[in-house]
C-alpha cells in the first residue's frame, strides 16, 4: 500500500501574477471560481498554468478570464480539442459582479488576476480591482523594498 502524501499548507498555490502587483495598485480583492474542462483540471494539478498576462472582462452581466494559459498535458484525451488560451467564465455572485461593474466604470481602473490556487478540491482565482502605476510609483516601491531588505539584514547582524 502506498502512503498518502502529506499536504503542505503553502502548496495550494498553482500560479502567481507577480507582475500585477508591480504594475498596479490593488484596491480590493475578490475570490472567484473557474468554469473548467477536464483537461484543464489535469494540467492545473500538474502545475502547468500561467496567468502572467491575464485580465478580467465583464460582458453581458458575466465575468470572463482572458489571457490565462493552461498548457495541456501530453496524456490528455486525444478526442478533446485543447485550447490553452480559451476564455474561462468566472463564477461570482451577482452582488460581487455589481460591485466590480461599479468599480471599473471609474477612469483608469481594471480587474486583473492575482493568483490561482486550490481551495479544498476547487480551483479558485483571486482577482483584484487595480489602478495602473506610473513609473515613479514603481521606482519608489522598489526603493522601499530594498530598504526593508537592508533593514532586516542590519537587524539580523546587530544581534550577533
Curated annotation (Swiss-Prot):
MF terms (GO), sorted A to Z: RNA binding
Gene Ontology cellular-component terms listed: cytosol
Predominant localisation class: cytoplasm
Compartments (UniProt record): Cytoplasm
Example GO BP: trans-translation
Entry-linked CDD domains: SmpB (cd09294)
Superkingdom classification of source: Bacteria
InterPro entries: SmpB, SsrA-bd_prot, SsrA-bd_prot_CS
Coiled coil (residue ranges): none
Keyword annotations: Cytoplasm, RNA-binding
SUPFAM superfamilies attached to this UniProt entry: Small protein B (SmpB)
Biological role: Required for rescue of stalled ribosomes mediated by trans-translation. Binds to transfer-messenger RNA (tmRNA), required for stable association of tmRNA with ribosomes. tmRNA and SmpB together mimic tRNA shape, replacing the anticodon stem-loop with SmpB. tmRNA is encoded by the ssrA gene; the 2 termini fold to resemble tRNA(Ala) and it encodes a 'tag peptide', a short internal open reading frame. During trans-translation Ala-aminoacylated tmRNA acts like a tRNA, entering the A-site of stalled ribosomes, displacing the stalled mRNA.
PANTHER family: SSRA-BINDING PROTEIN, TMRNA-BINDING COMPONENT OF TRANS-TRANSLATION TAGGING COMPLEX
Family of this protein: Belongs to the SmpB family.
Name of the protein described by the UniProt record: SsrA-binding protein
Organism: Cronobacter sakazakii (strain ATCC BAA-894)
Amino acid at each position: 500500500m502506498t502512503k498518502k502524501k502529506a499536504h503542505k499548507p503553502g502548496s495550494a498555490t498553482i500560479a502567481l501574477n507577480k507582475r500585477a502587483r508591480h504594475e498596479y495598485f490593488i484596491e480590493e480583492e475578490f475570490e472567484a471560481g473557474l468554469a473548467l474542462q477536464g483537461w484543464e483540471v489535469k494540467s492545473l494539478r500538474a502545475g502547468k498554468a500561467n496567468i502572467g498576462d491575464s485580465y478580467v472582462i465583464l460582458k453581458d452581466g458575466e465575468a470572463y478570464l482572458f489571457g490565462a494559459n493552461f498548457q495541456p498535458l501530453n496524456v490528455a484525451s486525444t478526442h478533446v480539442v485543447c485550447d490553452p488560451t480559451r476564455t474561462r467564465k468566472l463564477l461570482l455572485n451577482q452582488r460581487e459582479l455589481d460591485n466590480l461593474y461599479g468599480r471599473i466604470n471609474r477612469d483608469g481602473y481594471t480587474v486583473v488576476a492575482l493568483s490561482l490556487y486550490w481551495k479544498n478540491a476547487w480551483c479558485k482565482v483571486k482577482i483584484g480591482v487595480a489602478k495602473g502605476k506610473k513609473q515613479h510609483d514603481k521606482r519608489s516601491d522598489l526603493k522601499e523594498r530594498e530598504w526593508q531588505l537592508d533593514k532586516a539584514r542590519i537587524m539580523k547582524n546587530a544581534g550577533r
